Amino acid sequence: AVGVAQSALETGMQYALDRTQFGKALIEFPRVAGKLAMMAVEIMIARQLTYFSAWQKDNDKRCDLEAGMAKLLGARVAWAAADNALQIHGGNGFALEYRISRILCDARILNIFEGAAEIQAQVIARRLLD
């Protein structure tokens, strides 16, 4: 999931650098730059939670709570990043020629493949009650 989110960020960033509106690159517009900045922050948080979960497992510690959190957050961050990158692309984001259209599909399916968000939330809630 973090890889999908990272791909969305990189794709959105490149498009914002390449595409111009009103004589300026899209990245120079505060709303676009803000979207990219928040994507980077959220991706870093999801990545670090994933690393922490893996560290717990590597050190023979219980990690079901952390793994569930990483799955839930990773899938949500991937979807948000793909959606933001699509918004940066504007109408072009829906064209199959643009990579972001595929990334959006990949991000959407993560909640299904990695366990539905509701199931992950239940796993987390049950573990918190232990």
Locate the predicted segments by residue.
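Alpha-helical interface subdomain recognition
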Residues: 1-130
